[in-house]
Regions:
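Catalytic core of nucleotide-sugar-dependent glycosyltransferases
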Residues: 189, 208-232
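N-proximal low-complexity "stem/linker" segments adjacent to membrane-targeting elements
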Residues: 1-27
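A conserved acidic beta->alpha catalytic loop
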Residues: 31, 39-48, 89
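Conserved donor NDP-sugar-binding/catalytic core segment of glycosyltransferases
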Residues: 97-130
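Cell-envelope/extracellular polymer assembly enzymes that use nucleotide-activated donors
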Residues: 3-6, 34, 179
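Glycine-rich, basic loop-to-helix element that forms the pyrophosphate-binding segment
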Residues: 63-80
Length: 253
């Protein structure tokens, strides 16, 4: 099969990082790619950089004010026409030029979701290690919506649901990505582990900078999906796990 991948990049004032993200997409060896860039009316040179690449490559883009990250991501979903959707926001990158080719080789007529590993990188794009190696969140061999009971076990940048399964994002919740992934998984029947590192994730982001609020939002999302009492016990485990992880001198990203 030769599925079309809709890659969506959301950016606001991202002149320092957007070019590397764009290059990782337009330099893919796999040809069936729809690339969408959603800019939130940046005031720096972001739009100038986007225009430069849009003149050379088939990039569809908009630049307008939005109501935040997830509003912009919803705009991207509405614009997408491909088979599978991947959010690769400014600063994140596909890890190699043949990444989409490897993923496409895993697709069957019945595939609903594809997923894989994520490489963590610093601001100089030095690879730190995979998310499974360096954090408490280990990528499951078999991913199900129940796998999310203790948090985000798969990185957004390495998760490709079929477009027909994708709901709109919640607004005003920093853990809306968890809710979105759970809903996609709940709607899926055939979920494929690609057994490959898909993306490079630049450390930082909204949820990192507003950590306390993101934890509260995560609690509310998981309570909605798993119930009050199970969520209490799950979060006791989350706290216990984080404590022991820190005790062994590892950084929790």
């Amino acid at each position: 099969m030769q599925p079309i991948f809709s890659i969506i990049t959301v950016v606001f004032n991202g002149e320092a990082y957007i070019e590397g993200t764009i290059q990782s997409v337009v330099n893919q060896t796999y040809p069936h790619v729809e690339y969408l860039i959603i800019d939130g009316a940046s005031k720096d040179k972001t739009v100038e950089i986007v225009k430069k690449y849009a003149e050379k490559y088939p990039i569809r883009w908009i630049s307008e004010r939005d109501k935040g990250l997830y509003d912009a991501m919803n705009k991207g979903l509405k614009m997408a026409t491909g088979d599978f959707v991947l959010f690769l926001n400014a600063g994140d990158r596909l890890i190699s030029g043949d990444t989409l080719e490897k993923i496409a080789a895993c697709v069957t007529p019945h595939t609903d979701i594809l997923y894989g590993e994520t490489m963590l990188v610093d601001e100089k794009y030095h690879q730190i290690g995979t998310r499974s190696e360096l954090t408490v969140q280990k990528l499951p061999e078999k991913l199900m919506w129940q796998s999310m009971k203790n948090g985000m076990v798969v990185c957004h940048q390495s998760f490709l649901p079929h477009r027909k399964l994708t709901p709109q994002y919640l607004q005003g919740n920093l853990a809306a990505d968890i809710d979105w992934v759970i809903k996609c998984l709940q709607s899926a029947e055939n979920i494929t582990n690609t057994h490959t590192v898909i993306s490079e994730y630049l450390m930082g982001g909204v949820s990192k900078k507003q950590h306390q609020q993101s934890l509260k939002d995560r609690y509310a999302i998981l309570k909605k999906h798993f119930g009050f009492l199970p969520n209490i016990f799950n979060h006791l485990y989350i706290v216990w796990r984080a404590f022991w992880f820190k005790l062994w001198n590892k950084k929790t990203y």
